[in-house]
């Protein structure tokens, strides 16, 4: 019998100018199965050797920080979320750890509390809120105050172009400026405002236009992801709404009309043969827990 399983969707963040704020849950998943109690934590996985199999694993370490009193268990982890590709792999692990603690520790956390805790771990709400709530989220972190709004975007299709090369988030953040001129901040903020308004009003052409006009981060990250302009040009020609870096990169995130996503993905795959082209959907459920019996602390 499987006593407890947790499924967490991947996510993309920023959507162009919504830097560290806008996130979308995607149909790639991290699955965690909590098995029997053990003398110490054991994590069964088939990832690369650098991923810990003990209490240093991000899922376990997060769970133990959220609820230090939980007993060690054997857990099995599987995932089709690529690591260090800008698709929220670390955020999904953090969210999974919070939910494991929530279930084993009988914490009865609300969704808002999970977002608060996850944001404290991650440092920004976009990825974690999307993975917890599903759909499209717009979040703000101001000191200790976290505000998140969730909206539906069921008319959209998603394509992700995933390169073979990894790109560490710290490396991608290192190219960003430490200071931002006031006039540039005003311009960038205005574009981000219109992006969010267009998402809320389902004006998808405007969404696509705004997501390609970021000033906050993409101009500085182009040197790390030089194919972005050519992918953006082809995607638009094939009928996509817009293209942006997925999170910190190197994956590319494309929004399309839902009914055209397969056709556009096939066309892109013929052009960009060195990248994995994934036709995805927006995940609208967020974190899912299946519990067949109570196993407690």
Swiss-Prot record:
Function (record text): Catalyzes the ATP-dependent phosphorylation of L-homoserine to L-homoserine phosphate.
Stated family: Belongs to the GHMP kinase family. Homoserine kinase subfamily.
MF terms (GO), sorted A to Z: ATP binding; homoserine kinase activity
GO annotation terms (biological process): threonine biosynthetic process
Presence of the UniProt keyword Aminoacyl-tRNA synthetase in the record: no
Binding of ATP, residues: 82-92
A GO-annotated cellular component: cytoplasm
EC number: 2.7.1.39
UniProt-annotated location(s): Cytoplasm
Catalytically driven reaction(s): L-homoserine + ATP = O-phospho-L-homoserine + ADP + H(+)
Main location: cytoplasm
Lineage summary: Bacteria, Bacillati, Bacillota, Bacilli, Bacillales
Protein name per its UniProtKB record: Homoserine kinase
Keyword annotations: Amino-acid biosynthesis, ATP-binding, Cytoplasm, Kinase, Nucleotide-binding, Threonine biosynthesis, Transferase
Keyword Acetylation: no
């Amino acid at each position: 019998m499987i006593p407890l399983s947790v499924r967490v969707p991947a996510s993309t963040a920023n959507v162009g100018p919504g830097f560290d704020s806008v996130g979308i849950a995607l149909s790639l998943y991290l699955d965690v199965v909590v098995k029997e109690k053990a003398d110490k934590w054991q994590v069964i996985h088939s990832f690369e050797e650098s991923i810990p199999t003990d209490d240093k694993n991000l899922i376990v370490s997060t769970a133990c920080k959220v609820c230090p009193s939980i007993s060690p268990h054997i857990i099995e982890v599987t995932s089709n979320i690529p690591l260090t590709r800008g698709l929220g792999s670390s955020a999904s692990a953090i969210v999974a750890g919070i939910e494991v603690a929530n279930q084993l520790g009988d914490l009865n956390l609300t969704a808002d509390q999970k977002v608060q805790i996850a944001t404290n771990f991650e440092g920004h709400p976009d990825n974690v809120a999307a993975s917890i709530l599903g759909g499209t989220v717009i979040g703000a972190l101001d000191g200790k105050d976290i505000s998140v709004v969730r909206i539906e975007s069921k008319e959209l299709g998603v394509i992700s172009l995933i390169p073979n090369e990894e790109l560490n988030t710290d490396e991608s953040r290192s190219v960003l400026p430490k200071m931002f001129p006031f006039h540039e901040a005003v311009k960038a903020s205005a574009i981000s405002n219109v992006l969010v308004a267009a998402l809320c009003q389902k004006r998808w052409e405007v969404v696509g236009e705004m997501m390609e006009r970021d000033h906050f981060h993409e101009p500085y990250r182009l040197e790390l992801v030089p194919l972005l302009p050519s992918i953006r040009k082809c995607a638009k020609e094939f009928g996509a709404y817009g293209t942006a870096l997925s999170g910190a990169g190197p994956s590319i995130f494309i929004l399309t009309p839902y009914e055209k996503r397969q056709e556009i993905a096939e066309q892109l795959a013929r052009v960009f043969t060195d990248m994995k082209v994934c036709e995805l959907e927006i995940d609208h459920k967020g974190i899912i827990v299946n519990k067949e019996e109570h196993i407690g602390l």
